[in-house]
Each structure stands twice: as structure tokens, then as C-alpha cells.
Amino acid sequence: MPTIQQLVRKGREQLVFKSKSPALDSCPQRRGVCTRVYTTTPKKPNSAMRKVARVRLTNSKEVNAYIPGEGHNLQEHSIVLIRGGRVKDLPGVRYHIVRGALDTAGVNGRKQSRSKYGAKRPKPGQAAAAPAKGKKK
């Protein structure tokens, strides 16, 4: 425990905030170019083939970014928009690709949470014609 005189001389050291998405440089999103698009497997209790892209950002940093949703049109040299947000079961993946922005297409046939996946609003007539995946009448 410091004395009052020691506190007058030195003061308390402020805790430094450490960013969870340092490659964004305090920006909400960043543009980048895909250098590699691949699938990888998650950590121990989970099992899947997660879609991931290696992206070179405009600030010349390289990051791994998750491609959310079912199916995607990304390949090498695609221009993508990156936002922060990690994937808990993929070590080293701290960013998400924004669907429906730049070269990334939205998710086809998405009815719910459309804004998160860049899906357009379905036309009123089409809603009844195409039943959702996995649903039975």
C-alpha cells in the first residue's frame, strides 16, 4: 500500500484498454481483398466445416475472417467488407465478413434475420410458393 506522498509523486497507473479487433484501427469496418478462401474445423466439442477467408486489408494487415450464413460466392481476389466479432470455436478468427456488401452476395432464401445476412425482402407472392428449408407442411 503506497503512502500519500508516494501517490502524490507517482500517482496510480491507468489500465490500458486492449482492442479485441486491432486490425480495424478504431474503424467500424474495413475493406479488404481475399487472399485465400478455405474451410476449417472448430475446437473440441463442436464439429463442422467452417468457411473462413484470409483477407488483406486496406491498411495492409492480413486477418482471418469468418463467412457467415449458408453458401457464399467468395473466391480469391474478391473485395470484401470486414467487421469485428470473433468466432468462439475458431481460434485466430476475430473478424466477420459483412454479407451483401461489395463483392459478397447475401444469403439466398433467408426469411428471418435478413439484415444480418444481406438478404433482400421476399416478394409477397413468393413467400407461400417456396417453403423454408427443413420445414414440413
Curated annotation (Swiss-Prot):
Compositional bias annotation for Low complexity: 124-137
Entry GO CC: small ribosomal subunit
Highest taxon of the lineage: Bacteria
Location of 3-methylthioaspartic acid modifications: 89
Keywords on record: Methylation, Ribonucleoprotein, Ribosomal protein, RNA-binding, rRNA-binding, tRNA-binding
PROSITE patterns per the UniProt record, alphabetical: RIBOSOMAL_S12 (PS00055)
GO biological processes: translation
Region listing for Disordered, in residue ranges: 104-137
Gene3D superfamilies listed in its UniProt record: Nucleic acid-binding proteins
Cleaved signal peptide residues: none
GO molecular function, one term: tRNA binding
Compositional bias of kind Basic residues: 111-123
Protein's job: With S4 and S5 plays an important role in translational accuracy.
Quaternary structure, from the entry: Part of the 30S ribosomal subunit. Contacts proteins S8 and S17. May interact with IF1 in the 30S initiation complex.
Protein family per UniProt: Belongs to the universal ribosomal protein uS12 family.
NCBIfam families per the UniProt record, alphabetical: rpsL_bact
Name assigned to this protein: Small ribosomal subunit protein uS12
